[in-house]
């Protein structure tokens, strides 16, 4: 199949999947353009704003991309009865949190990397979509070796923390009543 046919197929798939969205129906009626153009234009504008990073908006938009996509999949997983997708999503949130902590402490270095937030957004989308397996790949390559080396699986320590947290929550409940 030629690239032109692949592009047409992709656009028609977008049109089909968005047929029930009222705002896109209004766009189509008012402009005479397919719904897929609005979707692609919106994504294009989103990435241009990240790329330009005017007023620091790139950081916010990048973090929103890192929250919305896996957040949606996480909400679906919470409502499902299976646990097959839970490991992938838990792995994502561990990678996302680790990445944000490392990023916070390296802001001075990141200032010198051009288009950092664009690269970050692409990375977060890659690790955030469960079908790519990106979160598991990053976890296995970067976080797991560190955690195995420095974080001891101490069940007594975990139980002590859990008991302390329950004690605090019980105290708060007593104060509230």
UniProtKB/Swiss-Prot annotation:
It is found in: Endoplasmic reticulum membrane; Golgi apparatus membrane. Disulfide bonds: none annotated. Pfam families: TB2_DP1_HVA22. Its main location: endoplasmic reticulum. Residues 55-56, 105-107 are lumenal. It is a multi-pass membrane protein. Keywords: Endoplasmic reticulum, Golgi apparatus, Membrane, Transmembrane, Transmembrane helix. The keyword S-adenosyl-L-methionine does not apply. InterPro entries: TB2_DP1_HVA22. Oligomer. Belongs to the DP1 family. It comes from Debaryomyces hansenii (strain ATCC 36239 / CBS 767 / BCRC 21394 / JCM 1990 / NBRC 0083 / IGC 2968) (Yeast). It comes from the Eukaryota. The lineage of its organism: Eukaryota, Fungi, Dikarya, Ascomycota, Saccharomycotina. GO terms for cellular component: endoplasmic reticulum membrane; Golgi membrane. The chain crosses the membrane at residues 35-54, 57-76, 88-104, 108-126. Required to generate and maintain the structure of the tubular endoplasmic reticulum network and the vacuole. Induces high curvature in membranes and causes membrane tubule formation. Involved in membrane/vesicle trafficking. This is Protein YOP1. The short lumenal loops between transmembrane domains 1 and 2 and between transmembrane domains 3 and 4 may impart a wedge-like configuration, thus deforming membranes. Residues 1-34, 77-87, 127-177 are cytoplasmic.
């Amino acid at each position: 199949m030629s690239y032109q046919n692949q592009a047409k197929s992709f656009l028609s798939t977008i049109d089909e999947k968005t047929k029930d969205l009222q705002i896109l129906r209004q766009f189509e009626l008012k402009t005479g353009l397919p719904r897929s153009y609005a979707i692609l234009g919106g994504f294009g504008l989103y990435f241009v704003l990240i790329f330009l990073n005017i007023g620091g908006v790139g950081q916010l938009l990048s973090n929103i991309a890192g929250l919305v996509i896996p957040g949606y999949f996480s909400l679906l997983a919470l409502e499902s009865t299976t646990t097959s997708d839970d490991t992938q999503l838990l792995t994502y949130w561990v990678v996302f949190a680790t990445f944000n902590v490392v990023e916070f402490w390296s802001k001075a270095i990141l200032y010198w990397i051009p288009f950092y937030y664009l690269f970050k957004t692409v990375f977060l989308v890659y690790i955030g979509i469960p079908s790519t397996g990106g979160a598991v790949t990053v976890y296995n390559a970067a976080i797991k070796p560190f955690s195995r080396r420095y974080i001891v699986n101490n069940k007594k320590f975990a139980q002590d923390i859990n008991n302390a947290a329950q004690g605090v929550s019980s105290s708060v409940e007593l104060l509230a009543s």
